[in-house]
Curated annotation (Swiss-Prot):
Keywords, ordered alphabetically: Membrane, Transmembrane, Transmembrane helix
Keyword Transit peptide attached: no
Species lineage: Eukaryota, Viridiplantae, Streptophyta, Embryophyta, Tracheophyta
InterPro entries: EamA_dom, WAT1-related
Membrane topology: Multi-pass membrane protein
Record's protein name: WAT1-related protein At1g60050
Locations listed in the record: Membrane
PANTHER family: WAT1-RELATED PROTEIN
Assigned protein family: Belongs to the drug/metabolite transporter (DMT) superfamily. Plant drug/metabolite exporter (P-DME) (TC 2.A.7.4) family.
Boundaries of every EamA domain copy: 26-155
Positions of transmembrane segments: 11-31, 42-62, 82-102, 107-127, 145-165, 194-214, 228-248, 255-275, 292-312, 315-335
Length: 374
């Protein structure tokens, strides 16, 4: 039984996390479809976050029902942190991410989302958080090389599309089926502004990397992760609502009808706030802080499968190549983070040297980071 339990503890989290990435890509395709069909990204962001915040508020208390709340939460310093987390992790990130998606495709979302550890590494260097950094260590070399590979993948993603992997075939039952799907779902449109979409998505990734730095210290002071998520989700929703009211003054754009847009808002709100967050927090506690981020490159696989199985004239060789290169750099950075320094290397370190920001990964980072919100 012990061996069987161990196998299940390995297999089940793997399958569940892979399915989480599949659901995320599926919702991203549906969001692209809704935005292409005329739905305002600002309206979509407000409604999905409002629903998610309403669900998270009671759920966060239920999630931590057996834990004692030793640290006062509603203090002035914590409220400032909550505001900044909402501003960077919800307001800036989601507005730029969904605008970027409206100009590009889900595969670009995957490629740019994989830039997060590279941006985090550069921000840590700029802010002086890499105390005692040994440039000769294999960890540092791996992170530097991984960062360069990530940026190379992003560059390829922007400048090279290449031919379609699955062009329109001659008339056949299969082609007729795919043509029918294209009337209901959108993966890519020729009118998309690829460069602008990529730039917006890169800015969104930079925003979430800044958010990462803020949240690291926050969850050390306030370890009840779901309450922190609930609070900054509400703060970000209010910020988005104020901004969207100016960006989308047409009241008719805010009207909800009983159609696919409404179903998508409900599905995205529930999945993003409760299902995915709970699964990621649970898996990170079971398997460690590096387990959940390792599944980010699975988004490339699912986007490629969906893009080639259900769409024609939608997925380019160049976009898959760029995403694959970015994924390689991402995995190299992750590999470097779990490596221990060679004890034979003499690197000057402070006695009170702390773990660098990428190593202090917490369930909050795993619960709501990168492009999982898209």
């Amino acid at each position: 039984m012990g061996l069987m339990d161990t196998r299940w503890e390995t297999i089940v989290p793997f399958i569940v996390m892979a399915l989480m990435e599949a659901c995320t890509i599926a919702l991203t395709i549906l969001a692209k479809t809704a935005l292409t069909g005329g739905m305002s990204p600002f309206v979509f962001i407000v409604y999905t976050n409002a629903l998610g915040s309403l669900l998270l508020l009671p759920y966060s208390f239920y999630f931590h029902r057996d834990e004692s709340d030793d640290e006062p939460f509603l203090t002035k310093p914590s409220l400032v942190r909550i505001f900044l987390l909402g501003f960077t992790g919800v307001f800036l990130f989601q507005n730029m991410a969904f605008l970027g998606l409206s100009y590009s495709s889900p595969i670009v979302v995957c490629a740019m989302g994989l830039q997060s550890p590279a941006f985090s590494f550069l921000l840590s260097l700029a802010l002086g958080k890499e105390g005692g950094l040994g440039w000769a260590s294999k960890r540092t070399k791996g992170r530097v090389i991984g960062t360069l590979i990530c940026f190379t993948g992003a560059f390829v993603e922007v400048i090279y599309l290449g031919p379609f992997i699955r062009p329109s075939p001659p008339s056949s039952p299969t082609s007729n089926f795919l043509t029918t799907i294209s009337h209901y779902l959108t993966f890519f449109k020729n009118s998309d502004n690829w460069a602008l979409g990529s730039l917006l998505l890169a800015c969104a990734t930079l925003s979430i990397s800044i958010w990462n730095i803020i949240q690291l210290d926050t969850v050390q002071k306030y370890p009840q992760v779901m309450k922190v998520v609930s609070a900054y989700s509400l703060a970000g929703t209010l910020q988005c609502a104020i901004f969207s009211a100016f960006m989308e003054p047409d009241l008719s754009a805010w009207e909800l009808k009983l159609n696919m847009d409404l179903y998508l808002i409900i599905a995205t709100g529930i999945f993003g706030s409760i299902i995915r967050t709970s699964v990621q927090v649970k898996c990170s506690k079971m398997k460690g802080p590096y387990y959940v981020p390792l599944f980010k490159p699975f988004g490339i696989l699912w986007a490629s499968i969906f893009g080639t199985s259900f769409f024609v004239n939608s997925l380019h060789y160049g976009s898959v190549l760029g995403a694959a290169i970015a994924g390689t750099g991402y995995l190299l950075i992750m590999w470097s983070q779990v490596q221990k320094d060679d004890p034979n290397e003499t690197v000057e370190k402070n006695d009170n040297h702390q773990l660098d920001s990428d190593e202090q990964t917490t369930p909050l980072l795993l619960a709501n980071g990168d492009f999982d919100q898209v």
